[in-house]
A protein has these predicted regions:
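Short, flexible coil/linker segments at domain boundaries that flank nucleotide/cofactor-interacting
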Residues: 1-2, 76
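Conserved acidic segment of CheY-like receiver
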Residues: 3-15, 19-20
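A structural signal for isolated positions on well-ordered beta-strands in alpha/beta enzyme cores
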Residues: 5-7, 34, 82
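Conserved sequence signature across two-component system core domains
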Residues: 9-10, 36, 54
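Alpha-helical interaction/dimerization surfaces of two-component signaling modules
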Residues: 18, 22-26, 45
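A generic structural motif
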Residues: 27-32
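Conserved Asp/Asn-Gly motif in the active-site loop of CheY-like receiver
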Residues: 33-40
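CheY-like receiver
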Residues: 43-126
Length: 126
């Protein structure tokens, strides 16, 4: 099975490092090809790496995960977005759905959710 190229985005350094270090991404079918600490940095990494999947925090300073999704869609870069959120506010979920988010996951994330996600994403045409 080919590994899905993954970019991870979170503006909280501790959470970003935790996402990078805590999970065995390769065993779940992902190759982490980049990470970003802001929406602006995420755009640069996504443009450069052309990942299959972007795992992004929804609320970040300056540029939100939703804004990143919008910009990438405008540029017609083909990738799947998985949004992470600590907020149970339905408005965020509604906005993400309008932008065709692939998956919306509430923090904290657990391994079972990520394994399920990996299997689900593997069935998409990336």
């Amino acid at each position: 099975m080919e590994l899905l190229k993954l970019v991870i985005v979170d503006d909280e350094p501790i959470l970003l490092q935790g996402l990078l270090d805590t999970y065995d991404w390769e065993s779940m079918g992902f190759e982490v090809v980049g990470s970003a600490k802001s929406g602006v940095q995420a755009l640069e990494v996504i443009r450069r790496e052309q990942p299959h999947v972007v795992l992004t925090d929804i609320r970040m300073k300056q540029m939100t995960g939703l804004m990143v999704m919008e910009e990438i869609q405008k540029e017609q870069i083909s990738c799947l977005f998985v949004v992470l959120s600590a907020y149970r506010d339905f408005e965020y979920a509604k906005q993400a759905i309008k932008l065709n988010v692939t998956e919306y996951i509430l923090k904290p994330v657990n391994v079972e959710e990520l394994n399920y996600l990996a299997k689900r994403l593997d069935s998409f045409d990336t």
